[in-house]
Amino acid sequence: MMAYSDTTMMSDDIDWLRSHRGVCKVDLYNPEGQQDQDRKVICFVDVSTLNVEDKDYKDAASSSSEGNLNLGSLEEKEIIVIKDTEKKDQSKTEGSVCLFKQAPSDPVSVLNWLLSDLQKYALGFQHALSPSTSTCKHKVGDTEGEYHRASSENCYSVYADQVNIDYLMNRPQNLRLEMTAAKNTNNNQSPSAPPAKPPSTQRAVISPDGECSIDDLSFYVNRLSSLVIQMAHKEIKEKLEGKSKCLHHSICPSPGNKERISPRTPASKIASEMAYEAVELTAAEMRGTGEESREGGQKSFLYSELSNKSKSGDKQMSQRESKEFADSISKGLMVYANQVASDMMVSLMKTLKVHSSGKPIPASVVLKRVLLRHTKEIVSDLIDSCMKNLHNITGVLMTDSDFVSAVKRNLFNQWKQNATDIMEAMLKRLVSALIGEEKETKSQSLSYASLKAGSHDPKCRNQSLEFSTMKAEMKERDKGKMKSDPCKSLTSAEKVGEHILKEGLTIWNQKQGNSCKVATKACSNKDEKGEKINASTDSLAKDLIVSALKLIQYHLTQQTKGKDTCEEDCPGSTMGYMAQSTQYEKCGGGQSAKALSVKQLESHRAPGPSTCQKENQHLDSQKMDMSNIVLMLIQKLLNENPFKCEDPCEGENKCSEPRASKAASMSNRSDKAEEQCQEHQELDCTSGMKQANGQFIDKLVESVMKLCLIMAKYSNDGAALAELEEQAASANKPNFRGTRCIHSGAMPQNYQDSLGHEVIVNNQCSTNSLQKQLQAVLQWIAASQFNVPMLYFMGDKDGQLEKLPQVSAKAAEKGYSVGGLLQEVMKFAKERQPDEAVGKVARKQLLDWLLANL
């Protein structure tokens, strides 16, 4: 039986990060000496790892559910729980099978994929522990609204994303657009643009690799001749409508045959219909009966036109229509048609009528000669016309930030072969922005720098210069729009920082011995001291600190003008989070900081109008203090002895920003405050970095990498800031466990029904050691939320979970809750980000890390 249960929605309402329920005991299952107790067995099966040939298991699963369970089509967000309804009375053990698909790990969005798997395990425990005996199929992330119930058959909700994306299956054009985007990746076509129809005369066969399997010359000549014929045909019609006369002369060179040849006799159907239609539309009489030619048996078809100059009114009308026609069609296409149409028509008709030794001459031979003769001047005119039209069009397009972002993404995707030059250009752009150059030099965008770095043709360089000039002209006009939307102005700089840091990490790990050469010019003019202690790590640490602080200063300065607008748009929760981080800095990360942070977090989330008013008053009174503290920290760190290489003008610029409390950069400040505390503590421990070691470098790299990832990913989004607040809370306070559970009062009765039932878990999935340990810990967290007194794990033949009982005992001894344990798991996942970015293997397994850090 397949049914949707109303109680399945309760696991979605659990606030996992703030749950204060205690952790349960964990042990490995040993069948020897076990008495027949009231326990439940849950078997979690990852259907993506099932063997296709294992038909007996699938048939058993299908028959037990009394329905058609197609495990191959099971979605990632779905979970199917099958309960054993045939248990015997003398046995107290009840079994359940939970079918699901594991979510792929995402190192950037740790919270999303951890909660996705945790929701699935929680649903499995919830259905297995409930007294209901029906089999349930549940979608993670569904709501009880009528819309989702009505469209549950054809609507799929993506749970892992921050935004709920609905894909309707009854609209086939959406699938077609996706297929078009996949096929036209190399053509730089937009996914929303419909695919262009091939010409009717095109007979090219496209191979799976996207290359033409027929002769390239004849293929392109065929397409080009079809285009020219159509343009000439349209030009004839326009001229006829403008009361111009088109005269066609049929010349019969044979002396014995002077009869007129019908225009419908040529073999080309397109040319015949075009000529016949032109003759029918014109009112002029056919002049001339024929001329003799020196070569016998040859026939030709000539095309010419005469303007009607007898009436001045017709002439003026013709001029007006000609002007409108030239305005409606691109100038480059008109130049192309006027220069090539006549020659193309003559050559085509000659080819179709001339016979040599009884065999026709291929049309491609004659067309190739014509094309080669006109290619140079045609391409030159087309380039000039396109650049002029591009200047007019981009004047409107460059004011659209979405278009600019799309252009930059295409530059990154299409020019991977010039990655070195592009990275150098981006680095120069970032350095010029960080050292505070004049605003006139900032007008050249990242697109121009990348285009100039990848162009080698003189004409392409001229085009890029015109493009940059046009962008500089639009800069002043674009300032008004950028003031109203300051959040999007940081997108390019944030992405540049992310790419530069990732490349820097890769190069640093490859060349650790020569990393001293990476020092920036800002620290190159510093006087060398007498003692040289760990030159490579010392210079790298200084470079990372100065770069991070300058990057923070740059973003604080950029957000000054849009402060008022951002403060109105952003909620007060962001300010509360910044106040929390600032209090943590002032207290030095001790127990008092923990108490202040908990108090601030509770007041920030407490309902009621009076609490909100107090919070607003408290935030308004601390705005100036927090801003001054942040600026003083930056100035103090940059004025230390190792960092006195900074220009004195930068200190004045930072001191001139007393009102730098901007909500759009709160996430950057919070992460910066954490980074500054770590750096300052490490500087005190190592006495000016004279004994800098690998651990200090790792912390610096992690802080800078985390800063760039946050700026690039979240980009001042409200929902993302809330998630960032939850993640950063665990990073700032490793022992943070005192928060409250918002939904604790909404627990259903069947949560309490699970008290007293010991649970045995069996995991049927072939994952690696790290994934298996992470899966077991998440199942431990889910079982603790449902008040399971004792959790057993069976099937640990390789001993990967032998340390889990020790971890559970230590967590219970330290007083950890469900929320605190989940925050520790998130902290472990975030520490693995720098290693995964450079392809390194994790230094510690999850259970070893928990034993060392709990």
Curated annotation (Swiss-Prot):
Record text about domains: RI-alpha binding site, predicted to form an amphipathic helix, could participate in protein-protein interactions with a complementary surface on the R-subunit dimer.
Protein source organism: Homo sapiens
Protein name as catalogued: A-kinase anchor protein 4
GO molecular function, one term: protein kinase A binding
Region of interest (Disordered), residue spans: 184-207, 287-323
Location of region: PKA-RI-alpha subunit binding domain: 336-345
One Pfam family hit: RII_binding_1
Tissue: Testis specific; only expressed in round spermatids.
Highest classification ranks of the organism: Eukaryota, Metazoa, Chordata, Craniata, Vertebrata
Phosphoserine carried by residues: 96, 130, 190, 213, 226, 272, 300, 304, 307, 342, 432, 443, 445, 447, 450, 464, 492, 536, 581, 627, 703
GO cellular component, one term: cytoskeleton
PTM entry text: Phosphorylated by STK33 during sperm flagella assembly.
Annotated compartments: Cell projection, Cilium, Flagellum
Recorded name of the encoding gene: AKAP4
Function: Major structural component of sperm fibrous sheath. Plays a role in sperm motility.
Superkingdom classification of source: Eukaryota
Region called PKA-RI and PKA-RII subunit binding domain, residue ranges: 219-232
SMART domains: AKAP_110
